[in-house]
Amino acid sequence: MRVLVLGSGVIGTASAYYLARQGHEVVVVDRQNGPALETSFANAGQVSPGYASPWAAPGVPLKAIKWLLQKHAPLAIKATGDVDQYLWMAQMLRNCTAARYAVNKERMVRLSEYSRDCLDELRAETGIAYEGRQLGTTQLFRTQAQVDAAAKDIAVLEASGVPFELLDRDAIARVEPALAGVKHKLAGALRLPNDQTGDCQMFTTKLADMAKALGVEFRFGQNIQRLDAVGDRLNGVWIDGKLETADRYVLALGSYSPQLLKPLGVRAPVYPLKGYSLTVPITNAEMAPTSTILDETYKVAITRFDNRIRVGGMAEIAGFDLSLNPRRRETLEMITADLYPQGGDLSQAEFWTGLRPATPDGTPIVGATAYRNLFLNTGHGTLGWTMACGSGRLLADLIGSKRPQISAEGLDISRYSGKNRELEAAPQPLRT
């Protein structure tokens, strides 16, 4: 079966790889000159299934009001006049209930845990190297209120069977020795020992090479113009003035996916959440992170690669603006200097921004659509790296009429539209 994949970020590349492993003829098309040159280029570097949580959570509306008044806030909103922006925010607010949070988090953790297992299997089978570490993730709490608020997340972790550890100040310093000098600033931490880290762009580039070895064709520098539909099927995709045809089509264009879907009458509530990162050269390895930490106050992750520290976070709801805001750099530098003052040279840091494709409920859109040969793999928000392998493998199974290893319940676009045309003959999943 010939499959045309639109997008060569970590999601599109993983989709292509797993489709090729099943024997399909795969072509990947992207406007960039290589894989992982947009959102996947310089993210925070975390593969953190246990921290897979929706931004839409109880208490977030009140927190958001406070954040908007803070200098180093994790969230900023810039009105664009775009109706989609207001609709997306309204949908997000509707998901800020305890009941919806629990449902959405379970879906996210389910896919993220599976994806981590797929990554482990891939690494064991192929030896793919991407400066990865399997040393866990530590969420730092600066206040007792944050420690107490973690109870709802711990309940979900327990229900999902995800191992975790609650740490006091001294235990934090044992896990991350470089934090010993600043432990007085911390009230506690939640550690997930099974979480991982790695350079997403490096991983995607190497996975693309592995996909090519399986016969996948990558076409870079291509202008994807529109989808062409006849009845309930796609007839092809117009690319640089030419209609490209296939048996199945996968849309993995992140924040840009809705633009192609709207003319078909498909509304995918995916909106860009602008994020920022710093890549800092390490000057003192003993004073740098051992693995990765997440500062709960600022929603910023600090991750160790081989000779670099990646600091990533923030969420700006500002449309498709890709300008670099110096105030965000100031925030990232402040947090890094506060926790790891001797770890790296901030004066030599590389500043970057990207657009995370976010859904209002936090769960990505993976699966079939009302068009029988069109499949979506988009809307992963801040968790594209975490969910990439699992999303790609799940989608390949759905396209190939294979039995998925996890339940796909609640992952496709039908949860928004009420329409679902997944493969009618698809068998029930083995693993729930």
Curated annotation (Swiss-Prot):
Catalytic activity: a D-alpha-amino acid + A + H2O = a 2-oxocarboxylate + AH2 + NH4(+)
Protein name per its UniProtKB record: D-amino acid dehydrogenase
Binding-site residues for FAD, renumbered to this chain: 3-17
Secreted recorded as keyword: no
Pfam families membership: DAO
A single Gene Ontology CC term: plasma membrane
Gene of this entry: dadA
EC code: 1.4.99.-
